[in-house]
Amino acid sequence: MPKYRSITTTHGRNMTGARALWRATGMTTEDFDKMIIAVVNSFTQFVPGHIHLRNVGALVSEQINITGGVAKEFNTIAIDDGIAMGHSGMLYSLPSRDLIADSVEYMINAHCVDAMVCISNCDKITPGMLMAALRLNIPAIFVSGGPMESGAITLSNQNVKLNLIDAITCSVDPNISDVDQQRIESAACPTCGSCSGMFTANSMNCLTEALGLAQPGNGSLLATHSDRKKLFLNAGKYIVHLAKSYYEENNYSVLPRNIANKSSFENAMMLDIAMGGSTNTVLHLLAAAQEGEIDFTMADIDKLSRKVPHLCKVAPNTQRYHMEDFHRAGGVMGVLGELHRCGLLHEDTRNILNKSLLETLLNYDIFSCDNFESKNMYAAAPAGIRSTQAFIQKNRWTSLDTDRRSGCIRSREHAYSQDGGLAVLYGNLAVDGCLVKTAGVHINLQKFSGPAKVYESQEESVQAILTGNIHSGDVIVIRYEGPKGGPGMQEMLYPTSFLKSMGLDLCCALITDGRFSGGTSGLSIGHISPEAANKGLIGLVHDGDIINIDISMRSITLEVSEHILKIRHAAEIARGNKAWTPTNRNRNISISLKAYAHLVTSADKGAVRDKSKLLG
């Protein structure tokens, strides 16, 4: 039977100094026989998805203390990708994921913590904490801050729902007046919470629910709704029970690696494919799997993407539905319920409630369950009140969306497509694979061929788009923006958003070794592996080269002869120490980013550290 880890610092004469310090934090003699449970918060005033979390940690801590543990709270950093977007700040976004994972490890191991509750929400915070949980493998529960309500505005006598992407695209839309631009900006993000579409933050919070590490409703229940408070209170209670089950009952099944096993990862990926989630989730799931020593790779994702139907569209893939509508339709459990009826899920996986997925669906799938409490939770609705505070309203929908023919979540028979919302493409341009969110690709763009317009930075591509140098039929190539080449694998939200604003999103393609925001739509292909900085073929593309893309065939091909490619390769090698680096790019790379670039692997490996460089 495992001993409390915290005994290391709370027992024995030689730990007198440690106990003296613990006493200074408020612990008593009686507390030294209890479990120490970390409340890993991520409150910050920089991020709307985290602005409301200051007092939430205290709620969780109180429940831990009441239930028999000793709660100790600390904070991680949290970068707002939307604010860091479009300038050098985005270089720090993906590296912050690994920094968060490390900081959680440091705090947990330095203080010999027994278990933890992870309070996350936005883009890199949930993945960073997930990596830490699987690395540490101590009892853990995730509970996120919840989604933002969608914005609303009246334009040309039409009521329009808004999200962050609308605020970005309107900035260069010549049809939007300065007055309306200001109105959209002021209305797009009305409350605290993670941005209101199925962007990266909400996608990841849905996936922690599917992995079994978070409670039902975690991914979709609005940040402003009073029902969400119950998730935090329950997390404080449940973590004590989980930890006691492990430490006192020798129950190893409650550990993160046993809950989030390969079958759970496959369930989570099937959810992501079915709901057309962010391509960033692939990067983060691959990274988390490596931390948990789980054999889950791009090959598994490719296999799943070929059999899972696309059942759900939420902004940015449609303007009709936002996270509040997804929740009304049953949220994560609603989609998993449909996948279960397709016979696709591993129904025996277990969660933090010590229930199998099948048992959980029987209680939380609104299409088939009779549980009043569950259905009442999924009726939680927005209030339309601007606020930075959590739990301020109790609005409810008068009915749930159980329309599986044309509603937010659909059955297989009425799916948007029998192919899922994400696809892995292969070819000479991406020998190790690349990703496209097919949920955001118009049917007329499923097969595309065009001449390349090559840029060696996001900034250069944006300038080309805004100055009219991109034309219908072009394939925009943005390279040296991968994990190593950027470094930091910037999100290309501005190029894709500006293409949309200029009316080019339905007649152009964009490919990159960088990545995309969860807010991206259009024929946007990212994560090209190997990246240019790792001698990938994308580094040899010239202006005018024809690139063929065929989503149905899962292919992406550079139509240049092997003879020409050998000549180009030799010319690149001849550049000496400048080989496989961008030409004439003016970018200040800090020491911390250089260290990141030195250790990072490619996108198809999750952009995690190359352990071989550390182990020798």
From Swiss-Prot:
Function of the molecule: Functions in the biosynthesis of branched-chain amino acids. Catalyzes the dehydration of (2R,3R)-2,3-dihydroxy-3-methylpentanoate (2,3-dihydroxy-3-methylvalerate) into 2-oxo-3-methylpentanoate (2-oxo-3-methylvalerate) and of (2R)-2,3-dihydroxy-3-methylbutanoate (2,3-dihydroxyisovalerate) into 2-oxo-3-methylbutanoate (2-oxoisovalerate), the penultimate precursor to L-isoleucine and L-valine, respectively.
Group of enzyme by EC: lyase
Binding site for [2Fe-2S] cluster: 122, 195
Domain of life: Bacteria
Stored NCBIfam families: ilvD (TIGR00110), PRK12448.1 (NF009103)
E.C. designation(s): 4.2.1.9
N6-carboxylysine modified-residue sites: 124
The protein, known as: Dihydroxy-acid dehydratase
Gene that produces this protein: ilvD
The family this protein is said to belong to: Belongs to the IlvD/Edd family.
